[in-house]
Amino acid sequence: MSAPAAPAQPAAERGVPRRLRLDNGLRVVITEDHDAPAVAVAVTYDVGFRSEPEGHSGFAHLFEHLMFEGSEHVGRGLHARLVQAAGGIFNGTTHRDHTAYYQVVPAEALERVLFLEADRMRAPRITEETLAHQIAVVGEEVRRNITGRPYGGFPWVQLPPAVFTTFANTHNGYGDLADLRASGPDDLAAFFDAYYAPGNAVLTVVGAVDADRCAKSIARHFGPLPARPVPPRARFGEPEPTADRIDVHDVPGLPLPALALGLRLPDPVGDFDGYRAATVLGALLGDGETSLLHRTVVRERRLATFVHAGAGLTGVPWEVRDPDVFVIRAMTPAEHTAEAVADAAFEALERLADKGPDPAALTRAAARLATEQYLTLDRLGSRARAHGRFELHHGDAALADRLPERLLRTTPRQIADAATALAGRHRRGVLLRPAPTHGGRG
């Protein structure tokens, strides 16, 4: 059995993440929080849909589904039933650069959840039957969320091909259903072997636990798992676009045109402060009815019925490594107003670059984002996942806890610099417009 190594940092204070690593490479972060008699357990794997090679698109998301279909000592569907029987909740989520699984249960159910997570990290059960079932489930998700809705997946599905060029950055997380249907259990087993090693994961525990006893329990359940090769960390950076480009899609049944622009952001890890400033800039520029773009584009000039701006392709910053994009999206009453909306967005960026933000508006925007982060951290499951993401991507789980304070320290100069960088980007985006109707009454 593997014993936990000495913690990388002391955790004498309640609520301070304690970090350790098992001999098999599993990174562990334990955070005591005794506000409620509950505990959250999350496992974050260093694989997302950007890691999928061509011909295997959608594997990361499909595998997330398969991880709930049973493991070496847990029958099909039993993982969910055991968590729910303890009074808990669970879920899994697939992102561009990681996949996360989490449970929130009463504190006395901690051992049960650690056993469940260790068992599926050891050996998930993948059969022809479970694979066929989950491919059908994914197909229904695609129909419900993408193909069966006029604005399905907008803009995270349609925008990347206009902004990026590589397969890793342009394909969406659902992938090509033809790739999934052509796969077999051996293909998914190979995916597990490549990416689901203990050394490619972070286990986070947040809640009413004693950190020392929790560390011993983790070592008991996860320590026997053998170390396996860990893939080199993938890098998905690509050159900046050198020309403007707006892709146009004619969509049947679309009520109104929709525009999305994607502007390359600073590296979220390598240039943390630049990315942070762009996040606050998004709140100033186009987040809510008091934002600059809503005031000018929606209320005053009536160029759009809705406008939003913010860091992160999916609308949620801090979830990825480089590259990421700043997204400006709008619903316009007519196709010809979309270009005017783009002009107005760049004019607003140029004004912020030249004059900087109104100090009071900056204070409000930063405070709103900080409050959102505090509310996220106040939920055990969300904090456990945040610790997993930040430990995985930044090597510092506690950075998630410090993020609200870092947001509040954003200066007018940093906002102006962020606006200058974005205003200098080429216009890359996508326009959805109602498909022409043909024919009429006979």
Q: In which residue ranges do the predicted regions lie?
A:
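Acidic/histidine-enriched segments that form metal/cofactor-coordinating
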Residues: S2-P7, Y45, E72, H79-F191, ...
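M16/MPP (pitrilysin/insulinase) zinc-metallopeptidase core fold and M16-derived inactive scaffolds
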Residues: D35, A40-V104, T170-G173, G288-F306
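A structural supersecondary motif
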Residues: A260-R264, G286-T332
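Short acidic/His-enriched helical or mixed secondary-structure segments at domain edges of catalytic enzymes
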Residues: G139-Q158, G237-L256, R299-H308, K355-D401, ...
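N- or domain-start disorder-to-order transition segments that initiate the globular core
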Residues: S2-P37
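An aromatic/glycine/proline-enriched structural segment found at the starts
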Residues: S2-A5, T165, G173, A197-P198, ...
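Buried hydrophobic packing residues in well-ordered domains
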Residues: G25, V43, H61, Y101, ...
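C-terminal regions of mature proteins
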Residues: S2-P10, V202-T204, L352, A360-G442
